[in-house]
Amino acid sequence: MKTRRFLSVFLLLALLAGFCMIPAQALEDPDIQAKAALLVDANTGAVVYAKNEHQELYPASLTKIMTALLTLEAVEEGRLSLDQELTATESALSGLSADGSSANIKAGEIMSVENLLYCMMVVSANEACDILAEAVSGSVDAFVDAMNDKAKELGCTNTHFVNPNGLHDSQHYTSAWDLYLITKAALEYDDFMRICDTGSITIPATNLSQERVLHTTNYLINGWRSRGYINKDAHGIKTGSTSDAGHCLVSSAQRGSLSFLSVVLGCERLTLEDGEIRTMSFYETNRLFNWGFDNFSYKTVVTADEYPKEVPVSLSKTEHVTVHPAQDVEILMPNGLSAGDLVRDIQLTGSPVEAPVSKGQKLGTMTLSYNGKTYAQVDLLASNDVDASKLLTFWRDVKLFFARPVVKIVGVILLVLVVLLLLWKLVFGRRRYRYGRSVGRGRNQGYRGRRRF
Protein backbone atom coordinates (compact mmCIF):
# COMPACT_ATOMS: atom_id res chain seq x y z
CA MET A 1 0.00 0.00 0.00
CA LYS A 2 2.41 2.60 1.14
CA THR A 3 5.72 3.08 -0.62
CA ARG A 4 8.61 4.22 1.58
CA ARG A 5 10.99 6.22 -0.56
CA PHE A 6 14.44 6.19 0.96
CA LEU A 7 17.06 8.57 -0.45
CA SER A 8 20.42 6.86 -0.26
CA VAL A 9 22.40 8.96 -2.70
CA PHE A 10 20.70 12.31 -2.48
CA LEU A 11 21.73 14.42 0.51
CA LEU A 12 20.34 17.86 -0.18
CA LEU A 13 19.35 20.50 2.29
CA ALA A 14 16.05 18.72 2.78
CA LEU A 15 18.05 16.47 5.09
CA LEU A 16 19.29 19.45 7.06
CA ALA A 17 16.46 21.90 7.74
CA GLY A 18 13.65 23.25 5.61
CA PHE A 19 14.43 23.34 1.89
CA CYS A 20 17.04 24.85 -0.37
CA MET A 21 16.65 27.00 -3.43
CA ILE A 22 18.88 25.73 -6.22
CA PRO A 23 20.96 28.69 -7.49
CA ALA A 24 19.80 29.65 -10.95
CA GLN A 25 23.21 31.05 -12.00
CA ALA A 26 22.18 33.30 -14.87
CA LEU A 27 19.27 31.07 -15.92
CA GLU A 28 16.51 32.92 -17.67
CA ASP A 29 13.51 33.30 -15.36
CA PRO A 30 10.53 31.44 -16.84
CA ASP A 31 8.25 34.22 -15.53
CA ILE A 32 5.35 31.88 -14.81
CA GLN A 33 1.99 33.62 -15.21
CA ALA A 34 0.32 32.60 -11.96
CA LYS A 35 -0.29 34.17 -8.58
CA ALA A 36 1.97 31.49 -7.10
CA ALA A 37 4.11 28.75 -8.61
CA LEU A 38 6.48 26.10 -7.36
CA LEU A 39 8.73 23.51 -9.02
CA VAL A 40 10.40 20.98 -6.74
CA ASP A 41 12.80 18.14 -7.41
CA ALA A 42 10.63 15.17 -6.46
CA ASN A 43 13.64 13.03 -5.56
CA THR A 44 15.20 15.36 -3.02
CA GLY A 45 12.76 18.13 -2.16
CA ALA A 46 15.08 20.82 -3.52
CA VAL A 47 13.24 23.88 -4.81
CA VAL A 48 14.01 24.60 -8.46
CA TYR A 49 11.60 27.53 -8.98
CA ALA A 50 9.42 29.47 -6.57
CA LYS A 51 7.07 32.41 -6.89
CA ASN A 52 4.99 33.56 -3.91
CA GLU A 53 5.13 29.98 -2.63
CA HIS A 54 3.99 30.94 0.90
CA GLN A 55 1.19 33.32 -0.11
CA GLU A 56 -2.25 32.32 1.17
CA LEU A 57 -4.51 31.63 -1.81
CA TYR A 58 -7.71 29.73 -2.57
CA PRO A 59 -7.01 26.14 -3.70
CA ALA A 60 -10.42 25.21 -5.16
CA SER A 61 -10.50 21.45 -5.86
CA LEU A 62 -6.81 20.97 -5.05
CA THR A 63 -8.33 20.56 -1.58
CA LYS A 64 -9.28 17.04 -2.67
CA ILE A 65 -5.64 15.97 -2.44
CA MET A 66 -5.94 16.25 1.35
CA THR A 67 -9.30 14.44 1.27
CA ALA A 68 -7.70 11.59 -0.68
CA LEU A 69 -4.73 11.52 1.71
CA LEU A 70 -6.92 11.11 4.79
CA THR A 71 -9.04 8.46 3.04
CA LEU A 72 -6.01 6.40 2.04
CA GLU A 73 -4.60 6.83 5.53
CA ALA A 74 -7.84 5.36 6.92
CA VAL A 75 -7.52 2.46 4.47
CA GLU A 76 -3.96 1.78 5.58
CA GLU A 77 -5.01 1.84 9.23
CA GLY A 78 -7.83 -0.62 8.55
CA ARG A 79 -10.67 1.79 9.30
CA LEU A 80 -11.80 1.49 5.68
CA SER A 81 -11.02 -0.74 2.72
CA LEU A 82 -10.95 0.19 -0.96
CA ASP A 83 -13.64 -2.34 -1.80
CA GLN A 84 -15.86 -1.30 1.12
CA GLU A 85 -19.23 -0.07 -0.14
CA LEU A 86 -20.61 3.22 1.16
CA THR A 87 -24.13 4.59 0.90
CA ALA A 88 -24.54 8.23 -0.08
CA THR A 89 -26.52 10.05 2.62
CA GLU A 90 -28.76 13.09 2.27
CA SER A 91 -26.43 15.00 4.60
CA ALA A 92 -23.42 14.26 2.38
CA LEU A 93 -25.25 15.60 -0.67
CA SER A 94 -26.74 18.68 0.95
CA GLY A 95 -25.26 22.15 0.73
CA LEU A 96 -23.30 21.50 -2.46
CA SER A 97 -23.23 24.02 -5.28
CA ALA A 98 -25.61 23.08 -8.08
CA ASP A 99 -23.08 24.08 -10.75
CA GLY A 100 -20.09 22.48 -9.04
CA SER A 101 -18.24 19.42 -10.30
CA SER A 102 -20.28 16.26 -9.82
CA ALA A 103 -20.54 12.59 -10.75
CA ASN A 104 -24.32 12.77 -10.19
CA ILE A 105 -24.26 10.42 -7.23
CA LYS A 106 -27.73 10.14 -5.70
CA ALA A 107 -28.86 9.76 -2.10
CA GLY A 108 -29.04 6.07 -1.27
CA GLU A 109 -26.63 5.11 -4.04
CA ILE A 110 -24.02 2.53 -3.07
CA MET A 111 -20.46 2.81 -4.34
CA SER A 112 -17.07 1.48 -3.21
CA VAL A 113 -14.44 3.64 -1.55
CA GLU A 114 -12.15 3.12 -4.54
CA ASN A 115 -14.77 4.23 -7.07
CA LEU A 116 -15.61 7.25 -4.94
CA LEU A 117 -11.91 8.16 -5.02
CA TYR A 118 -12.00 7.89 -8.82
CA CYS A 119 -15.06 10.15 -8.94
CA MET A 120 -13.32 12.66 -6.69
CA MET A 121 -9.88 12.71 -8.32
CA VAL A 122 -10.78 12.11 -11.99
CA VAL A 123 -13.88 14.30 -12.48
CA SER A 124 -13.56 16.25 -9.23
CA ALA A 125 -16.95 15.16 -7.86
CA ASN A 126 -17.76 17.28 -4.81
CA GLU A 127 -20.35 14.87 -3.43
CA ALA A 128 -17.79 12.04 -3.40
CA CYS A 129 -15.67 14.12 -1.00
CA ASP A 130 -18.44 14.46 1.56
CA ILE A 131 -19.43 10.79 1.31
CA LEU A 132 -15.83 9.77 2.02
CA ALA A 133 -15.53 12.38 4.78
CA GLU A 134 -18.50 10.92 6.64
CA ALA A 135 -17.09 7.41 6.27
CA VAL A 136 -13.65 8.39 7.58
CA SER A 137 -14.61 10.68 10.46
CA GLY A 138 -18.33 10.21 11.08
CA SER A 139 -19.26 13.70 9.92
CA VAL A 140 -18.03 16.33 7.51
CA ASP A 141 -17.23 18.73 10.38
CA ALA A 142 -15.10 16.12 12.15
CA PHE A 143 -13.33 15.37 8.88
CA VAL A 144 -12.52 19.06 8.35
CA ASP A 145 -10.96 19.12 11.82
CA ALA A 146 -8.86 16.12 10.80
CA MET A 147 -7.81 17.94 7.62
CA ASN A 148 -6.52 20.90 9.60
CA ASP A 149 -4.80 18.64 12.13
CA LYS A 150 -3.07 16.77 9.32
CA ALA A 151 -1.98 20.02 7.70
CA LYS A 152 -0.29 21.09 10.94
CA GLU A 153 1.32 17.66 11.30
CA LEU A 154 2.82 18.01 7.81
CA GLY A 155 4.26 21.43 8.63
CA CYS A 156 1.73 23.53 6.71
CA THR A 157 1.79 27.07 8.12
CA ASN A 158 -0.49 28.91 5.70
CA THR A 159 -3.42 26.51 5.43
CA HIS A 160 -6.95 26.42 6.80
CA PHE A 161 -9.66 24.15 5.46
CA VAL A 162 -13.41 24.66 5.81
CA ASN A 163 -14.72 21.79 3.67
CA PRO A 164 -13.44 18.58 2.02
CA ASN A 165 -14.16 19.63 -1.57
CA GLY A 166 -12.72 23.12 -2.06
CA LEU A 167 -15.94 25.03 -2.74
CA HIS A 168 -15.17 28.67 -2.14
CA ASP A 169 -15.06 30.10 1.35
CA SER A 170 -13.04 33.14 2.37
CA GLN A 171 -11.58 31.15 5.29
CA HIS A 172 -10.58 28.21 3.09
CA TYR A 173 -7.03 28.77 1.87
CA THR A 174 -3.56 27.29 1.52
CA SER A 175 -0.26 28.04 -0.25
CA ALA A 176 1.76 26.48 -3.04
CA TRP A 177 4.34 25.24 -0.55
CA ASP A 178 1.74 23.71 1.76
CA LEU A 179 0.09 21.98 -1.21
CA TYR A 180 3.47 20.53 -2.09
CA LEU A 181 3.80 19.14 1.45
CA ILE A 182 0.31 17.64 1.30
CA THR A 183 0.89 16.13 -2.14
CA LYS A 184 4.24 14.70 -1.12
CA ALA A 185 2.54 12.93 1.79
CA ALA A 186 -0.23 11.60 -0.47
CA LEU A 187 2.31 10.27 -2.96
CA GLU A 188 3.60 7.89 -0.31
CA TYR A 189 0.51 5.83 -1.14
CA ASP A 190 0.76 3.95 -4.44
CA ASP A 191 -3.02 4.04 -4.83
CA PHE A 192 -2.97 7.84 -4.85
CA MET A 193 -0.94 8.15 -8.04
CA ARG A 194 -2.69 5.16 -9.61
CA ILE A 195 -6.03 6.92 -9.20
CA CYS A 196 -5.08 10.52 -9.94
CA ASP A 197 -3.07 9.55 -13.03
CA THR A 198 -6.15 7.99 -14.63
CA GLY A 199 -7.14 9.59 -17.93
CA SER A 200 -10.50 7.86 -18.19
CA ILE A 201 -12.28 5.04 -16.40
CA THR A 202 -15.62 3.25 -16.44
CA ILE A 203 -17.34 3.02 -13.06
CA PRO A 204 -19.59 -0.07 -12.88
CA ALA A 205 -23.35 0.30 -12.58
CA THR A 206 -24.71 0.81 -9.08
CA ASN A 207 -28.08 0.25 -7.47
CA LEU A 208 -29.24 3.65 -8.76
CA SER A 209 -27.17 4.30 -11.89
CA GLN A 210 -25.92 2.79 -15.11
CA GLU A 211 -22.17 2.57 -15.55
CA ARG A 212 -20.37 5.89 -15.61
CA VAL A 213 -17.55 6.77 -18.02
CA LEU A 214 -15.29 9.34 -16.37
CA HIS A 215 -12.79 11.52 -18.26
CA THR A 216 -10.21 13.45 -16.28
CA THR A 217 -10.31 17.21 -15.92
CA ASN A 218 -6.50 17.16 -16.24
CA TYR A 219 -5.70 18.02 -19.85
CA LEU A 220 -2.00 17.19 -19.41
CA ILE A 221 -2.73 13.46 -19.29
CA ASN A 222 -5.88 13.11 -21.41
CA GLY A 223 -6.86 14.95 -24.57
CA TRP A 224 -10.50 13.90 -24.57
CA ARG A 225 -11.61 17.48 -23.98
CA SER A 226 -8.59 19.44 -25.21
CA ARG A 227 -5.49 18.03 -26.92
CA GLY A 228 -3.42 21.20 -26.85
CA TYR A 229 -1.88 20.53 -23.45
CA ILE A 230 -0.97 16.82 -23.59
CA ASN A 231 2.39 16.18 -21.94
CA LYS A 232 3.76 12.65 -22.29
CA ASP A 233 6.02 13.23 -19.28
CA ALA A 234 3.18 14.32 -16.97
CA HIS A 235 1.49 12.15 -14.34
CA GLY A 236 -1.59 13.29 -12.38
CA ILE A 237 -2.36 14.99 -10.13
CA LYS A 238 -5.30 17.38 -9.57
CA THR A 239 -7.01 20.35 -11.15
CA GLY A 240 -9.04 23.04 -9.44
CA SER A 241 -10.91 26.16 -10.48
CA THR A 242 -13.41 28.64 -9.14
CA SER A 243 -14.02 32.25 -10.05
CA ASP A 244 -12.24 33.32 -6.86
CA ALA A 245 -9.35 30.83 -7.01
CA GLY A 246 -8.72 31.03 -10.73
CA HIS A 247 -7.31 27.96 -12.45
CA CYS A 248 -5.02 25.78 -10.34
CA LEU A 249 -3.05 22.60 -10.96
CA VAL A 250 -0.78 20.24 -9.07
CA SER A 251 1.12 17.91 -11.37
CA SER A 252 4.20 15.74 -11.64
CA ALA A 253 6.45 14.89 -14.56
CA GLN A 254 9.33 12.54 -15.17
CA ARG A 255 11.88 12.48 -17.97
CA GLY A 256 14.80 10.12 -17.62
CA SER A 257 16.27 10.50 -14.14
CA LEU A 258 14.61 13.88 -13.60
CA SER A 259 11.34 14.06 -11.69
CA PHE A 260 9.48 17.23 -10.74
CA LEU A 261 6.42 18.23 -8.74
CA SER A 262 4.73 21.48 -9.72
CA VAL A 263 2.06 23.71 -8.21
CA VAL A 264 0.43 26.68 -9.92
CA LEU A 265 -2.30 28.78 -8.29
CA GLY A 266 -4.42 31.65 -9.52
CA CYS A 267 -3.94 31.26 -13.28
CA GLU A 268 -6.23 32.88 -15.81
CA ARG A 269 -8.15 31.56 -18.79
CA LEU A 270 -7.27 33.73 -21.77
CA THR A 271 -8.81 34.28 -25.17
CA LEU A 272 -6.00 34.84 -27.67
CA GLU A 273 -6.13 37.05 -30.75
CA ASP A 274 -6.84 34.08 -33.00
CA GLY A 275 -9.79 33.13 -30.81
CA GLU A 276 -8.00 30.26 -29.07
CA ILE A 277 -8.99 29.83 -25.44
CA ARG A 278 -5.94 29.06 -23.31
CA THR A 279 -6.25 27.69 -19.78
CA MET A 280 -3.05 29.02 -18.28
CA SER A 281 -2.78 26.48 -15.46
CA PHE A 282 -2.03 23.75 -18.02
CA TYR A 283 0.00 25.99 -20.31
CA GLU A 284 2.21 27.39 -17.55
CA THR A 285 2.71 24.00 -15.92
CA ASN A 286 4.04 22.67 -19.23
CA ARG A 287 6.34 25.68 -19.50
CA LEU A 288 7.56 25.11 -15.96
CA PHE A 289 8.28 21.42 -16.58
CA ASN A 290 10.09 22.13 -19.85
CA TRP A 291 12.18 24.84 -18.18
CA GLY A 292 13.22 22.38 -15.48
CA PHE A 293 14.04 19.56 -17.89
CA ASP A 294 15.95 21.85 -20.27
CA ASN A 295 18.08 23.61 -17.66
CA PHE A 296 18.83 21.11 -14.89
CA SER A 297 20.53 17.75 -14.58
CA TYR A 298 21.95 15.46 -11.91
CA LYS A 299 25.70 15.66 -11.44
CA THR A 300 28.00 13.65 -9.21
CA VAL A 301 29.82 16.23 -7.11
CA VAL A 302 31.48 13.92 -4.57
CA THR A 303 32.68 10.33 -4.89
CA ALA A 304 33.28 7.91 -2.05
CA ASP A 305 36.80 7.09 -3.24
CA GLU A 306 38.24 10.58 -2.86
CA TYR A 307 40.31 11.60 0.17
CA PRO A 308 39.77 15.30 0.82
CA LYS A 309 41.47 15.56 4.21
CA GLU A 310 44.12 14.14 6.55
CA VAL A 311 43.16 14.30 10.20
CA PRO A 312 45.87 14.52 12.90
CA VAL A 313 45.82 11.62 15.37
CA SER A 314 46.93 11.73 19.01
CA LEU A 315 47.89 8.84 21.33
CA SER A 316 49.32 6.88 18.41
CA LYS A 317 52.58 6.39 16.58
CA THR A 318 50.58 7.12 13.39
CA GLU A 319 50.37 10.87 12.92
CA HIS A 320 47.41 11.11 10.51
CA VAL A 321 44.37 9.25 9.22
CA THR A 322 42.72 10.01 5.89
CA VAL A 323 38.96 10.46 5.59
CA HIS A 324 36.62 9.82 2.67
CA PRO A 325 32.95 10.65 1.91
CA ALA A 326 30.45 8.08 3.16
CA GLN A 327 28.96 7.73 -0.34
CA ASP A 328 28.75 9.33 -3.75
CA VAL A 329 26.70 12.51 -3.73
CA GLU A 330 24.59 13.32 -6.78
CA ILE A 331 22.61 16.54 -6.83
CA LEU A 332 20.39 18.49 -9.19
CA MET A 333 22.26 21.46 -10.63
CA PRO A 334 21.84 24.02 -13.39
CA ASN A 335 23.54 22.76 -16.53
CA GLY A 336 25.95 25.70 -16.48
CA LEU A 337 27.22 24.84 -13.02
CA SER A 338 29.87 22.19 -12.32
CA ALA A 339 31.13 20.40 -9.24
CA GLY A 340 34.21 22.61 -9.27
CA ASP A 341 32.05 25.68 -8.69
CA LEU A 342 30.91 24.39 -5.30
CA VAL A 343 32.68 25.45 -2.11
CA ARG A 344 33.66 22.59 0.20
CA ASP A 345 33.55 23.25 3.92
CA ILE A 346 34.98 20.46 6.09
CA GLN A 347 34.10 20.32 9.78
CA LEU A 348 35.91 17.71 11.87
CA THR A 349 34.55 16.21 15.08
CA GLY A 350 38.02 16.64 16.57
CA SER A 351 41.47 17.71 15.43
CA PRO A 352 43.48 15.87 16.48
CA VAL A 353 41.30 12.81 16.90
CA GLU A 354 42.30 10.39 19.65
CA ALA A 355 43.37 6.85 18.83
CA PRO A 356 42.14 4.19 18.54
CA VAL A 357 40.29 5.02 15.32
CA SER A 358 38.15 2.41 13.57
CA LYS A 359 37.81 2.19 9.81
CA GLY A 360 34.45 3.73 8.84
CA GLN A 361 34.27 5.86 12.01
CA LYS A 362 32.65 9.26 11.42
CA LEU A 363 35.25 11.97 11.86
CA GLY A 364 33.44 14.95 10.35
CA THR A 365 31.16 16.33 7.65
CA MET A 366 31.67 18.08 4.34
CA THR A 367 29.17 20.73 3.21
CA LEU A 368 28.91 21.79 -0.43
CA SER A 369 27.60 25.27 -1.18
CA TYR A 370 27.41 27.88 -3.91
CA ASN A 371 26.92 31.61 -3.35
CA GLY A 372 26.03 30.95 0.28
CA LYS A 373 23.36 28.35 -0.56
CA THR A 374 23.88 24.81 0.71
CA TYR A 375 23.65 22.06 -1.88
CA ALA A 376 24.55 18.94 0.09
CA GLN A 377 26.19 17.54 3.19
CA VAL A 378 27.98 14.21 3.51
CA ASP A 379 29.66 12.42 6.41
CA LEU A 380 33.45 11.93 6.34
CA LEU A 381 34.64 8.49 7.50
CA ALA A 382 38.03 7.14 8.57
CA SER A 383 39.67 5.23 5.73
CA ASN A 384 41.63 2.82 7.94
CA ASP A 385 42.18 1.65 11.51
CA VAL A 386 44.65 3.47 13.74
CA ASP A 387 45.90 1.68 16.87
CA ALA A 388 46.54 3.51 20.11
CA SER A 389 49.97 3.55 21.81
CA LYS A 390 49.78 1.92 25.25
CA LEU A 391 52.48 4.19 26.69
CA LEU A 392 50.93 7.39 25.34
CA THR A 393 47.51 6.25 26.49
CA PHE A 394 48.89 5.51 29.99
CA TRP A 395 50.40 8.98 30.34
CA ARG A 396 47.18 10.49 29.01
CA ASP A 397 45.23 8.60 31.66
CA VAL A 398 47.64 9.75 34.37
CA LYS A 399 47.24 13.35 33.30
CA LEU A 400 43.48 12.98 33.14
CA PHE A 401 43.46 11.41 36.62
CA PHE A 402 45.32 14.29 38.18
CA ALA A 403 43.26 16.79 36.21
CA ARG A 404 40.04 15.57 37.83
CA PRO A 405 38.49 18.14 40.22
CA VAL A 406 38.18 15.61 43.06
CA VAL A 407 41.83 14.66 42.77
CA LYS A 408 42.82 18.32 42.73
CA ILE A 409 40.75 19.00 45.85
CA VAL A 410 42.24 16.00 47.64
CA GLY A 411 45.71 17.11 46.57
CA VAL A 412 45.15 20.59 47.94
CA ILE A 413 43.87 19.14 51.21
CA LEU A 414 46.91 16.87 51.50
CA LEU A 415 49.21 19.77 50.72
CA VAL A 416 47.57 21.86 53.42
CA LEU A 417 47.91 18.98 55.89
CA VAL A 418 51.59 18.58 55.04
CA VAL A 419 52.18 22.30 55.51
CA LEU A 420 50.34 22.23 58.83
CA LEU A 421 52.34 19.22 59.92
CA LEU A 422 55.59 20.95 59.06
CA LEU A 423 54.50 24.07 60.89
CA TRP A 424 53.47 21.99 63.88
CA LYS A 425 56.82 20.25 63.92
CA LEU A 426 58.61 23.51 63.51
CA VAL A 427 56.76 25.26 66.32
CA PHE A 428 56.50 22.42 68.81
CA GLY A 429 59.90 21.10 67.92
CA ARG A 430 61.49 24.38 68.98
CA ARG A 431 59.52 24.43 72.21
CA ARG A 432 60.66 20.94 73.11
CA TYR A 433 64.19 21.87 72.22
CA ARG A 434 64.10 24.95 74.45
CA TYR A 435 62.46 23.02 77.25
CA GLY A 436 65.08 20.32 77.03
CA ARG A 437 67.88 22.84 77.24
CA SER A 438 66.35 24.61 80.23
CA VAL A 439 65.97 21.33 82.13
CA GLY A 440 69.53 20.43 81.32
CA ARG A 441 70.83 23.70 82.68
CA GLY A 442 68.91 23.22 85.92
CA ARG A 443 70.42 19.87 86.49
CA ASN A 444 73.86 21.12 85.70
CA GLN A 445 73.54 24.00 88.19
CA GLY A 446 72.60 21.63 91.07
CA TYR A 447 75.58 19.34 90.56
CA ARG A 448 78.64 19.99 92.67
CA GLY A 449 80.66 17.02 91.71
CA ARG A 450 81.39 13.87 93.68
CA ARG A 451 82.15 14.31 97.30
CA ARG A 452 85.43 13.01 98.43
CA PHE A 453 86.01 11.38 101.73
Model-derived regions, located:
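Active-site-adjacent loops and short helices of periplasmic peptidoglycan-processing enzymes
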Residues: 24-177, 181-190, 195
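Domain-terminus/edge residues, biased toward the C-terminal soluble/receptor-binding domains
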Residues: 156-160, 170-173, 177-437, 449-452
